Amino acid sequence: MSSLALSQLLLAVTLPLLELEPTFVPTAQSELSPYGGKSGQQLNQYSGEGESVLVSSYVHLEFSSTAWPQELSKNFTLPTALAVLPPKTLTGLGLTTECRANHSGTSLCTCHPGYQWNATLCSLYPHCWGRRSERDSCMCRSFHGPVTGYCQLLPPVPANLILDSQLQMHGNTLNLILLKKEEATNLRWFLRHSKNHTPISLWPGTNVLQTSSEGQSGLRVARMSRHWAGEYESIFEAQGFRWRLRQLVKVPLQEEEVVRLPDALSISCTASTGFQLSCCIPLTTDYTATWSPGEDSQASLQKMSDSQCFVLAVPHCPATNTTYTCTLQSQNLPPLVAPVSITIIQDGDTTCPEDFSVVSWNVTKAGFVAQAPCPVNKKGVVKRLCGTDGIWRPVQNTCTEAKILTLCLKAKLLEGQGKPYEEVPWILSELQEQVGVASTPSDLWEMLHTVTLLAKVVAETSTELTGSALKDLLTTTDKILDANISALWTLAQAQEPSMGSDFLKAVETLVHSLRPQQHPFSFSSANVLLQSQLLRHSSPPGYQMSFSTWPLLQARIPWHSLAPLVHSGTNVSITSLVLQKLDYRLPSNYTQGLWNTPYTTPGLILVVSITADGQAFTQAEVIMDYEDMNGTLHCVFWDHRVFQGQGGWSDEGCEVHAANASITQCICQHLTAFSILMSQHTVPENPTLDLLSQVGTGASVLALLVCLAIYGLVWRVVVRNKVAFFRHTTLFNMVICLLVADTCFLGSPFLPSGYHSLICLVTAFLCHFFYLATFFWMLAQALVLAHQLLFVFHQLSKHVVLSLMVMLGYLCPLGFAGVTLGLYLPQRKYLWEGKCFLNGGGVMLYSFSEPVLAIVGVNGLVLVIAVLKLLRPSLSEGPTVEKRQALVGVLKALLILTPIFGLTWGLGVATLFDGSIVSHYAFSILNSLQGVFILVFGCLTDKKVLEALRKRLRGSRSSNSAISMVTNETYTSEHSKERSEPASYEERMTD
């Protein structure tokens, strides 16, 4: 403190007065009084002759700052007003107030222990500068000019703060009770953390409940954690003073808060002689750590910005498998033990080799998970499983930006701590800067969770956002919806399907919270458009707004919906928000009336809100015009209440009107998030179509059984060369896969449907897998044929090609089917409603239709190559024969390859672009008869198969009547050494 020009001291002087006449006794300084009034009003009244009473006089002393202690030891001269009275004896001297004045004329007046400024004066004058921690205390006040009061003697404490136990377990409920002996007012609660002495105000939020009744008040914290540990303060006013009661609360460190890197380790002593173990805890906790065993090892402490790590450097491999233990201890708290198991890799153990992709992976024993730290400024761990076969599995990255985690934690603590009106805008400002650095699904999830938490806080506290804060929110939303992080959305939604719905609800809530003074307000970006305005008496009738989006969108609210609000004299604010691409991130959930039909959305969501005097209104008629929309349309809104809180599309209260040929009009009777569903080519339930599919599939099953019987009779005869072997092997596996798939399809209607039925789930999985396998075997046949056509003289190894075909035919579809099951079953989107088959929405599209159509495309390309080869002129034949053979070859290729390669699935494309029933009939009939096509064109039109079948049926056993197999290569016959002539291309089609 700077040098002081003058020091003042206020004393409480206690005097016994004998035989006094009843009178008022003034203080030494008449300008000083407890409440800033005249001190002459203070008295002790003499109650009778011969009695003795005590009179307290407050004496104002002034002296130099360096000599005042010595002045106190001198004899006091009583003021003149007291000197005329009979002799007095000084029985007590108490220091009440010490004031130090600086050169600017400001006096800092501090109360001595046992005294305090009264509550009225305490609220009138500021706390002493530089003593922020005491700003809610009445121990020191700053006066600019004359000091207008003095500290008073405190009465007994009028309340008690009760806590069941200082030690609170994680997740438990904390209950603090303030028992009041006197009437208390202006009660407030604060929390001081052990590492931060700044008090944090507590308010009634999601995690905090404040109660009050006669004689007591309470504070309840619903879910305790280390972020709620510290010293709780209760500040209130009673008996004219401000009181502060404190209670210390501790929360033990939890096991999940201890980060062990690694938590388990397999090590090869030949590749590495030593290793390092880390045991990290939050910096805010007061713990010490010890490692055991610790012999011949060096332990150290490393402190980061928000954590501290106890590191053990082990220079040598232990002789056997060892468990190292990190024991964490804190005063008056139970110890916490964090074990780390070390496994020594022995000779002969299966291991994964060193790998330096992404991060450095050391030699790891099969079945163990290797761990690596996250990059700088990220929290979490990078994991990678070493499979039992010694092959590294994909990297699992759970790293999250430390700054994003900090913002999310601050938003979480706003459920009862801090000042939302200050911290919500700050978090929004910081968050929009972090979107650009998001690189993992956990980054995206934490950002969306932060916005959701902020929305809850804003709704609970009725916090109003400034235009700047709302702009930060909309900028963040625009970046989150950008296509650059679309891959993060897919991965994150696999773990949290409702995150898109929660984000939509949060943005709706925050947009509603714009201050009325900020209207009108507008914002425009690539993915977010917002327009808001105030309606007054002078506003034109109704409300209308247009957006330059695709499809073009206009929204209006008729005057009859707004008139009651405007005529009441309140300022009505209307906000229209368009979010593009967010509808793609919402779950594919549809309420009753919209089931069993795959839909698409135009890529935008319209959110309309009406607010009057801070109150949101949900009922109003909204008319929306969408331009250039085709197909069957449904006007819908996103209902957050359905599907166990995940939300879903509903058409309740909305109806569609065709305004004209190019405009579709939606009219809804409520305010929420609107969109339009496009089911461009929906075919209604058709019993005839279903019957034809069942009959065709049954015929296909019978045909496939006949085909298997034929192969059982003639197999050894027809596969005597490589080309024939490859062709008939693919056909045989196609028959097996299609037979199993069709059988499951026919039996599925007789099974109990739903996710509770295991047999239903198994049937759906088998249908998916074997139908896919059928087409992958078709692809294998096409690729083998393409090789024979393009590389005539290249020899193929039977074992290599067979292995490749098996991998392509079974492992690839198994991967598709397994991933689909893992992604969509937890979301309950795997099954078609009421059926034991794949969901007809996005599941069918992405996991079945797209792979099938891709295979059909490749097979179509092979067909084109075959046709071009057939049209190539032959040098050995004349023009007439050449033309005839070319035409015959084309017809044969079209008739055989089209059904065999599944090109009839190309009709599926027609069902996407043609809404007529004809394309659906053609598609269903042709594909249900796939097994019949394989029997006819794969077996019965093959002259070699027919010849072998006839001979087998006639009982011919002669080995000399071997069927001549014509291939695209020269070969030596099993019974003849003569060269055969090269086969024509059309013959290769049938081989």
Curated annotation (Swiss-Prot):
Keyword vocabulary terms for this entry: Disulfide bond, G-protein coupled receptor, Glycoprotein, Membrane, Receptor, Signal, Transducer, Transmembrane, Transmembrane helix
UniProt PTM: Autoproteolytically processed at the GPS region of the GAIN-B domain; this cleavage modulates receptor activity.
Disulphides: C635-C666, C654-C668
Protein's recorded name: Adhesion G-protein coupled receptor F3
Subcellular locations according to the entry: Membrane
One Pfam family it belongs to: 7tm_2
Its job: Orphan receptor.
Presence of keyword Metal-binding: no
Membrane topology of this protein: Multi-pass membrane protein
Superkingdom assignment: Eukaryota
Record topology, Extracellular segments: 21-694, 752-757, 821-850, 914-916
GO molecular function, one term: G protein-coupled receptor activity
Organism field: Mus musculus (Mouse)
Gene: ADGRF3
GO cellular component, one term: membrane
Glycosites: N75, N102, N118, N321, N362, N484, N571, N589, N630, N660
Residue segments, region Disordered: 964-991
SUPFAM superfamilies: Family A G protein-coupled receptor-like, Hormone receptor domain
Family: Belongs to the G-protein coupled receptor 2 family. Adhesion G-protein coupled receptor (ADGR) subfamily.
